């Protein structure tokens, strides 16, 4: 493998750094138990994330005006509860449930892997999450980024090329010496289109319970790993 010259590493956050599936499933179970509701927590969790992805893509394609991740999550949450005929939850409690996405737990390798990489490279979050969410998530998990960048800075969502190009420009780096790390092929394909290097991280249940991404030929990515801790080893070769 050709040695990669990298100075800046950008990380997707939801699913890549944080295990959204396990965290939201637990929050959904707690919510259901608290209000004595009866529904399939796995299906609800998967549909919440799928609904976000659908609205996010509409924003990125110009079919919807810009909405923050918090706003999209709330819109989808209300739709899911309406479909279940659940309409007696107070606004305050709905907001708290929606903020489950602020309380995600990181993958076991995330903190140690990021800490090691930070010793050698500039590391930055580059996420579809709004900035307030990213700050809370990082603070709650004691993750110390060099930079936190949100797609809300650019008024769109990944994989819009202007997100990646804008992020590189803000950190005064260049695309050829920047790497995007993500557990979604579409995210990395967007980074490739912007001229960046890429690293695919396998994460279970990222596209729903037991569902694998149709990621195609992984050889188009510069690195393919099972954990963050592998990235440093590859880059040092």
Show where each model-derived region lies.
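Asp-based, Mg2+/Mn2+-dependent phosphohydrolase catalytic module
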Residues: 1-9, 115, 129-237
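N-terminal helical cap/lid subdomain that shapes the substrate entry/recognition surface
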Residues: 3-108
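A short, structure-level motif marking secondary-structure boundaries and short turns
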Residues: 14, 61-63, 97-99, 119, ...
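Glycine-centered loop/turn motif at secondary-structure junctions
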Residues: 36, 85, 120-121, 142, ...
């Amino acid at each position: 493998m050709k040695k990669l010259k990298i100075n800046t590493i950008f990380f997707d956050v939801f699913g890549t750094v944080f295990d959204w599936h396990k965290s939201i499933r637990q929050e959904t179970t707690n919510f259901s138990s608290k209000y004595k509701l009866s529904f399939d927590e796995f299906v609800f969790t998967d549909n919440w994330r799928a609904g976000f992805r659908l609205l996010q893509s509409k924003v990125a394609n110009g079919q919807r005006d810009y909405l923050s991740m918090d706003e999209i999550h709330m819109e989808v949450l209300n739709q899911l509860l309406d479909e279940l005929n659940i309409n007696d939850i107070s606004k305050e409690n709905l907001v708290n449930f929606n903020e489950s996405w602020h309380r995600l737990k990181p993958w076991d390798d995330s903190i140690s892997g990021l800490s090691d990489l930070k010793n050698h490279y500039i590391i930055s979050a580059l996420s579809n999450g709004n900035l307030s969410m990213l700050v809370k998530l990082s603070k709650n998990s004691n993750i110390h980024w060099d930079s936190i960048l949100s797609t809300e800075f650019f008024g769109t969502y990944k994989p819009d090329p202007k997100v990646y190009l804008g992020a590189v420009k803000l950190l005064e780096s260049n695309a050829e010496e920047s790497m995007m790390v993500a557990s979604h092929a579409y995210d990395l394909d967007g980074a490739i289109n912007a001229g960046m290097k890429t690293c695919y991280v396998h994460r279970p249940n990222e596209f729903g319970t037991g569902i694998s991404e149709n990621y195609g030929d992984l050889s188009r990515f510069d690195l393919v790993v099972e954990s963050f801790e592998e990235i440093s080893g590859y880059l040092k070769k």
